[in-house]
């Protein structure tokens, strides 16, 4: 049987995600971000709600990406997620992309010339942002051009790099309907951005979300809910360079900007430069919110939920892979658990995220 991996955020889960799961074959394993997202923002609803949405709509097993994999630039995000899925025995990786290319060929190219390609990136001027450097590399070695608004294509290339040299086949699926950042309501498939923006419009949600009741009942948060706490973390920290990935230049810019910024959005605008993209600045602010430090990634994989098919697969992995299904006295990953506690501060009605929580079981599928 084919074992298909999917790397996702489901922020929130919508019909486009359901379409992706429907297109995937065999046993479907999802490696999903926890409560903080790749582009440096809190999830609109918590990880358990999103895992349940996925399991109700075709996923067989949902595992959690640790905080320091979730909140990373595309390459590290892809690498960390593929590592986890590889250990769970996937033989193919399915993903949505705006531009369906021969990603397998691209992965083979990276297998062959990876070292040379990375050297090329290192030698590019520092005035370029990391995404610009990566795009220059793909243009040079694979003749790829970027149309600009294609974040899923950028992630797809990160997955191609991550599977290089592994026995995993890549299966791109053409993205349906609205673009990633689109807030357009008049489409067949709405984007997660649009659903977050129109979260109070029930008709809209019902048109584009398969598990709409779950979403409506869940406690929701946005970045602004954490602004007072973020402000406190910035003002009370004498040296922001002790925080993961924060350099001197960014520390100075953030300290200066917080004096006048009235919101997270304003702070991001003030700190962003040509070299430091908004997504990168949001990630840095997320690290500051968490007081994140460089840390080793957990050995074990945290299971959020499964169907009967997924449970059988986990049984077959016993003894080969370290799995955590209940976080108790023994921590799974201190950094992720701390992030979960801080996530709960954004809305007092968010349920406890770790202690006493057991994987969601979906009986029928």
From Swiss-Prot:
A single MF term (Gene Ontology): ligase activity, forming carbon-nitrogen bonds
Catalytic activity reported: cytidine(34) in elongator tRNA(Met) + acetate + ATP = N(4)-acetylcytidine(34) in elongator tRNA(Met) + AMP + diphosphate
Chief subcellular location: cytoplasm
Keyword Membrane: no
A GO CC annotation given for this chain: cytoplasm
Transmembrane intervals: none
Protein's UniProt keywords contain ATP-binding: yes
Chain positions recorded as ATP binding sites: 7-20, 96, 152, 175
Location within or outside the cell: Cytoplasm
Described function: Catalyzes the formation of N(4)-acetylcytidine (ac(4)C) at the wobble position of elongator tRNA(Met), using acetate and ATP as substrates. First activates an acetate ion to form acetyladenylate (Ac-AMP) and then transfers the acetyl group to tRNA to form ac(4)C34.
Family: Belongs to the TmcAL family.
Protein name, per record: tRNA(Met) cytidine acetate ligase
Gene: tmcAL
